[in-house]
């Protein structure tokens, strides 16, 4: 029996780390692409390093030759292209970089496979995005909903989607896009709104932050658990024919709902007052007497600084096709469970960070006084 060999771009990210764990558990030989950097950004996969069948290689989505060489060396049977500049707001500040990685990077992967004559033996999964729907024309969105990208990130991802489809039809390659709706976890980057909320709730509950500032509280999103979504990525490549699939829960929530639930799991109940830019989240009650000093205080406020130049306000995915054709369950982890997982993790993180800070302060003081040398 031939061995399953997976090559993952974006292996150090949220999805890459979960996918690596998933594939290793299935007996895959997993190869991940990392970039050379003076900063250590591998904490999400640190626990996997040294694991048999898990290998890391230096390459770059902006360097065609490095990808061609690596694909030729690894000879993968499956490629999961998860690498991206994936922050919508950043794409307005760095549109050219976003296009190079998120659009042309997909083409480089496809050509690396063709250059090594692996078109018939290597399947390719492309991580696409619900941001393709942008200024939505219908709800919920499915595989047939028209695209209306509303940011440089979404436009770049749209190229990636169409070039995958073109190579599938022109060269008979098994390449597919998974149109991922928002998927979160305790490994989510701290600049993304969900992780920003759960960290702030934990910090406010532990006296490390006074207020959380957000943008449009009415924005609607379909949030799922990243750990569940990587299973669907794999199922897409196991399907008998190459097709594109929406990966979503089919359930929608506002940013306001996410914030309310996050603070609830941190022991703080909010009430909302005002509208638009003047809306505020005020502490109505607390579960622990030690937090009683917060009652009546504003802990969530709206800031225009966090409004996007063009804001996508209504993303809601229809996962029916993935359910029927792949047998995937989009709600293995509920919205409430997801938020609780993230808050519990961040409560522990904030507490651990505080202990580490105290230890560093004490050590500095002891060194200054000559107590330790």
Give residue ranges: language-model regions:
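Conserved metal-phosphate-binding beta-hairpin within the catalytic cores
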Residues: 247
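Residue-level signal for the nucleotide or nucleotide-sugar donor/cofactor binding architecture
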Residues: 62, 93, 101-104, 151, ...
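NAD(P)-dependent short-chain dehydrogenase/reductase
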Residues: 136-140, 150-152, 158, 162-238, ...
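Generic alpha-helical secondary-structure signal
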Residues: 70, 94, 101, 196, ...
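N-terminal Rossmann-like NAD(P)+-binding domain of SDR-like oxidoreductases, especially those catalyzing
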Residues: 1-183, 227, 233, 237, ...
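Residue-level preference for the first positions of well-ordered beta-strands
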Residues: 5, 211, 242-244
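Conserved C-terminal active-site "lid" loop/helix of NAD(P)H-dependent oxidoreductases
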Residues: 226, 285-329, 348
């Amino acid at each position: 029996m031939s061995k399953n060999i997976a090559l993952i771009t974006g292996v150090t990210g949220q999805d890459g780390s979960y996918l690596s764990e998933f594939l290793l558990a299935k007996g895959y030989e997993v190869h991940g692409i990392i970039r050379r950097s003076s900063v250590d950004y591998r904490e999400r996969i640190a626990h996997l390093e040294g694991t048999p069948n898990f290998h890391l290689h230096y390459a770059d989505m902006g360097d065609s030759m490095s990808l061609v060489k690596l694909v030729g060396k690894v000879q993968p049977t499956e490629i999961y292209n998860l690498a991206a500049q994936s922050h919508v707001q950043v794409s307005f500040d760095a549109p050219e970089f976003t296009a190079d990685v998120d659009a042309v990077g997909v083409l480089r992967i496809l050509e690396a496979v063709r250059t090594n004559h692996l078109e018939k033996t290597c399947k390719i999964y492309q991580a696409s995005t619900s941001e393709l729907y942008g200024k939505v024309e219908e709800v919920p969105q499915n595989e047939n909903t028209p695209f209306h990208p509303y940011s440089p990130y979404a436009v770049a991802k749209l190229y990636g989607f169409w070039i995958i489809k073109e190579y599938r039809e022109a060269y008979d390659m098994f390449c597919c896009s998974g149109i991922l709706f928002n998927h979160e976890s305790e490994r989510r980057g701290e600049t993304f709104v969900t992780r920003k909320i759960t960290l702030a709730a934990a910090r406010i509950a532990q006296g490390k932050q006074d207020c959380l500032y957000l943008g449009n509280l009415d924005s609607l999103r379909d949030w799922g658990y990243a750990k569940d979504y990587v299973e669907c990525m794999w199922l897409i490549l196991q399907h008998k024919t190459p097709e594109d699939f929406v990966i979503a829960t089919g359930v929608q929530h506002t940013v306001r709902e996410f914030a309310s639930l996050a603070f609830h799991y941190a022991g703080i109940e909010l009430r909302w007052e005002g509208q638009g830019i003047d809306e505020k989240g005020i502490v109505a009650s607390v579960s622990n007497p030690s937090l009683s000093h917060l009652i009546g205080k504003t802990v969530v406020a709206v800031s225009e600084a966090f409004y996007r130049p063009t804001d996508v306000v209504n993303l809601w995915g229809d996962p029916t096709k993935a359910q029927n054709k792949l047998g995937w369950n989009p709600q293995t982890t509920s919205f409430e469970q997801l938020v609780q997982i993230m808050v519990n993790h961040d409560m522990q993180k904030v507490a651990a960070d505080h202990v580490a800070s105290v230890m560093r302060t004490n050590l500095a003081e002891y060194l200054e006084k000559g107590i330790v040398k």
